[in-house]
From Swiss-Prot:
Residues the record lists as Deamidated glutamine modifications: Q204
Recorded consequence of changing K257A: No effect on binding to PLCD4
Any GO BP annotation: adenylate cyclase-inhibiting G protein-coupled receptor signaling pathway
Name the record gives this protein: Guanine nucleotide-binding protein G(i) subunit alpha-3
Binding site residues for GDP: 43-48, 151, 175-178, 269-270, 272, 325-326
Result of changing K248M: No effect on binding to CCDC88C
Record gene name: GNAI3
Length: 354
């Protein structure tokens, strides 16, 4: 006699099939979802990488979004010129022309309007005269001795354009803005049939305790290092060299037991600034034992080795290193394409398909 299923049994089989199908779909979805954690010390370029993802994968910033950055551009410009003027007092540098002392006093009186997104012709004139001054330029050339925004010269050299009443920030202006990241900023985008979730975590020391719950199930970590930080100290601790701080943090991330299976991608960032700086500021400031030349290639390769040598699992764990300029969209696009290929390859390995 043939075996027939009762209605109840049939329903159970259908339920089982549906569960299997859902599990398979969930598995496929999980395989296509990529969680990227952006880590690195403060001001290493993490937030700029996030902005680039919006430009490359999400059609960039709309005109309305760009307009909202106007106040940040003005604030960054004002903060930069004020930082230089204050440093002149500390470094005992005089103005090239005595009349600039009056401009400096005016700057502090007029600065408030820029914080509201307005750059008056009077304020723009004051900043232009100060920026052209020989003493101000001498102080700017010693910016490693105090804290100064990387984009200072970018904005100050372009005051004629950004002080126009009808000024709307460009994509590049937006990329150059500096706002301290607090907490966790999450960005989503699709690329090469993968769904990316990127988490940008505040880099300053006070923010690091908030990172912990981001770590679980992460596909890859992109660790950003500012190459140009080799001769700078931390904003939070003037005794600590920024590059040494980055190495300490990278060591703790790279060798963490939670990240045994996690791909570690190292972005040695701000290569453009490093290439300029290494000509006049020797690498021995950071690495006294360094005996190589102060050429970009040799000095950059030495820093790369310092970081890669921190990996205590060389036999089983590879560090994928890229030299980047986070403000250069084409460079970031090229590098991120290579990063995605590594992620796809590693995903296939886990599935036994590579």
């Amino acid at each position: 006699m043939g075996c027939t299923l009762s209605a109840e049994d049939k329903a159970a089989v259908e339920r089982s099939k549906m569960i299997d199908r859902n599990l398979r779909e969930d598995g496929e979805k999980a395989a296509k979802e990529v969680k990227l954690l952006l880590l690195g010390a403060g001001e290493s370029g993490k937030s700029t990488i996030v902005k680039q993802m919006k430009i490359i994968h999400e059609d960039g910033y709309s005109e309305d979004e760009c307009k909202q950055y106007k106040v940040v551009v003005y604030s960054n410009t004002i903060q930069s010129i004020i930082a230089i003027i204050r440093a002149m007092g500390r470094l005992k540098i005089d103005f090239g022309e005595a009349a600039r002392a009056d401009d400096a006093r005016q700057l502090f009186v007029l600065a408030g309007s820029a914080e509201e997104g307005v750059m008056t012709p009077e304020l723009a004139g004051v900043i232009k005269r100060l920026w052209r001054d020989g003493g101000v330029q001498a102080c700017f050339s010693r910016s490693r001795e105090y804290q100064l925004n990387d984009s200072a010269s970018y904005y100050l050299n372009d005051l004629d354009r950004i002080s126009q009443s009808n000024y709307i920030p460009t994509q590049q202006d937006v990329l150059r803005t500096r706002v301290k990241t607090t907490g966790i900023v999450e960005t989503h985008f699709t690329f090469k049939d993968l769904y990316f979730k990127m988490f940008d975590v505040g880099g300053q020391r006070s923010e690091r305790k908030k990172w912990i719950h981001c770590f679980e199930g992460v596909t890859a970590i992109i660790f950003c290092v500012a190459l140009s930080d080799y001769d700078l100290v931390l904003a939070e601790d003037e005794e600590m060299n920024r590059m040494h701080e980055s190495m300490k943090l990278f060591d703790s991330i790279c060798n963490n037991k939670w990240f045994t299976e996690t791909s570690i991608i190292l972005f040695l960032n701000k290569k453009d600034l490093f290439e300029e700086k290494i000509k006049r500021s020797p690498l021995t400031i950071c690495y006294p034992e360094y005996t190589g030349s102060n050429t970009y290639e040799e000095a950059a390769a030495y820093i790369q080795c310092q970081f890669e040598d921190l990996n205590r699992r060389k036999d089983t764990k590879e560090i994928y290193t890229h030299f980047t300029c986070a403000t250069d969209t084409k460079n970031v696009q090229f590098v991120f394409d290579a990063v995605t290929d590594v992620i796809i390859k590693n995903n296939l390995k886990e599935c036994g398909l590579y």
